[in-house]
Amino acid sequence: MPGVTGAPVLTASTAEEALEAHRRSLLGLCYRMLGSPFEAEDAVQETMLRAWRSVERFDGRSELGTWLHRIATNVCLDMLKGRRRRAVPMDLGPAQAPVAENLHTRSEATWVLPIPGALVAGEDPADSVVAEESIRLAFVAALQHLPPRQRAALILCEVLSWQAAEVAELLDTTVASVNSALQRARATLQSRGLRRESAAARARLPDLQMLRRYVDAFQRYDLDALTKLIHADATQSMPPYDMWLAGRDDVLAWWFGPGIGCRGSRVLPVGTANGSPAFGQYKPSPGGFEPWALQVIEVEDSLVRQFTFFLDTERVFPLFGLPPRLDA
């Protein structure tokens, strides 16, 4: 992100609007660094506070966005000191059998949490495609395996298109060190089987007809219809439980076994989470339907390849604008 000399100097009267114009980009950076939309929002607030305190010292020798991203990166690095990394259940052990005895919870701080695509989408459609690709759950989870400074270097260079020299200045290191960090970071992501798809490929969200068929089949809990919509190698996870399932047969064995209480659920589309279709799921309860999970599905060849059910509805549903209850 090259700097531009001669940018307008900020004053207290012009700063607030100028700072807010960069909020989405800052939130995207902080989310990729931290793996939680709630921590990312805290980091953005701290970034704005630090920027506001020093706004009259901003002399316009670099772009305002560059200056803010430097502050935000340092805020995230401070927040990551001494923290354990966030993960997805697949990081923590092998797939398990679809039986209730395998359900074990871990704390909220363990998990990569979802973020609405609308919160980080840019105004330019091309920028939005890049943003959605780089907040995929698999990508964000893989980033958490990188040491914080490697993580920052990769995000700044490969997602935000900074030059290595700019990152070196921010991290107080050399260009050679940044390039070495990038090489190690890429190797780590590759070792974790992360596929870097083209922007054009990621832009092709599942067609609406396929999503409608899925919603209809799920709400009817129709085994035959669901079988036709789920990939043979599908996976399922349900944070905060660390159990995950591998294969369509085990997924459906769970749904029609221990998960049979989801029969009769209502499902509300909420756009995208992490670049993938997302739905609010409500289970039947006396007099209506109560929140159960935010479903995030990844689709491959018109079949659902991955299900993630985020069960912390008390926090996640408000984030996605979902109502606290549905009437019968």
Where are these predicted regions, by residue range?
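Acidic, proline/glycine-rich intrinsically disordered inter-domain spacer in sigma factors
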Residues: 2-5, 10, 97-137, 200-205
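A short, charge-rich alpha-helical start-of-domain segment used by transcription regulators
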Residues: 2-28, 38-41, 52
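C-terminal and inter-domain tail/linker signature
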Residues: 24, 49, 91-95, 123-126, ...
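Hydrophobic-face residues of short alpha-helical interaction/recognition segments
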Residues: 26, 30, 68, 72-80
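Arg/Lys-rich amphipathic alpha helix in sigma70-family domain 2
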Residues: 73-91, 98-105, 191
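Short amphipathic helical patch at the helix-1/turn junction of helix-turn-helix
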Residues: 20, 31, 157-159
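Short loop-to-helix capping motifs
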Residues: 35-37, 61, 221-222, 232
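Sigma70-family region 2
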Residues: 36, 46-64, 78-87, 144, ...
